[in-house]
């Protein structure tokens, strides 16, 4: 690792620990040349996921897009940012566990909605209204009826 201060390639590891639910290693290093301490992260190299969008175009999977959508859906709601990070991590690992290299944006949305429904139902409806592109209020109400019937079943 190059020192960010003097560009020396000679450093020693001072501390090492797991990060990101053991999917990465955080290392604290000290430059042997100038004594500067800096942090590096070692991540598992995973093959890229390709998202097939509704119009058929393909783009690289970006977890930040999921997180940004969740943040917008949960604005002014009692949802902690860490919960949104957890949902994003779970969705990404579910997709990678499926072993596919290409995944449709529809499948990603379904994964997100399944997890978000259990965190905050208002945020779920907000997310679903954008994701499912409701054409009118009737479609929105139909989606909400599904939530209400699920709640009644789980209350019994």
From Swiss-Prot:
Lineage: Bacteria, Bacillati, Bacillota, Bacilli, Bacillales
Organism: Staphylococcus epidermidis (strain ATCC 35984 / DSM 28319 / BCRC 17069 / CCUG 31568 / BM 3577 / RP62A)
Keyword Repressor set for record: yes
Zinc finger (unnamed) boundaries: 3-34
Gene Ontology annotations of biological process type: negative regulation of DNA-templated transcription
Listed PANTHER family: TRANSCRIPTIONAL REPRESSOR NRDR
GO MF term list: ATP binding; DNA binding; zinc ion binding
HAMAP family assigned: NrdR (MF_00440)
Domain ATP-cone, chain residue ranges per copy: 49-139
PROSITE patterns on file: ATP_CONE
Cofactor binding notes: Binds 1 zinc ion.
Keywords assigned: ATP-binding, DNA-binding, Metal-binding, Nucleotide-binding, Repressor, Transcription, Transcription regulation, Zinc, Zinc-finger
Similarity field: Belongs to the NrdR family.
Top-level taxon in the UniProt lineage: Bacteria
Cofactor: Zn(2+)
Name of protein: Transcriptional repressor NrdR
Purpose of the protein: Negatively regulates transcription of bacterial ribonucleotide reductase nrd genes and operons by binding to NrdR-boxes.
């Amino acid at each position: 690792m190059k020192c960010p201060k003097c560009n020396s390639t000679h450093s020693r590891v001072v501390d090492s620990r797991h990060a990101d639910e053991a999917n990465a290693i955080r290392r604290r290093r000290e430059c042997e040349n100038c004594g500067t301490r800096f942090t590096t992260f070692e991540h598992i190299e995973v093959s890229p996921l390709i998202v097939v969008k509704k119009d058929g175009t393909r783009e690289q999977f970006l977890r930040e897009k999921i997180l940004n959508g969740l943040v917008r859906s949960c604005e002014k709601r009692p949802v902690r940012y860490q919960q949104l990070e957890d949902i994003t991590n779970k969705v990404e690992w579910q997709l990678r566990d499926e072993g596919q290299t290409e995944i449709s944006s529809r499948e990603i949305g379904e994964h997100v909605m399944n997890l978000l429904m259990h965190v905050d139902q208002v945020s779920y409806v907000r997310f679903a209204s954008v994701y499912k592109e409701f054409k009118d209020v009737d479609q929105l109400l139909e989606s909400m009826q599904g939530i209400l019937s699920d709640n009644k079943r789980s209350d019994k």
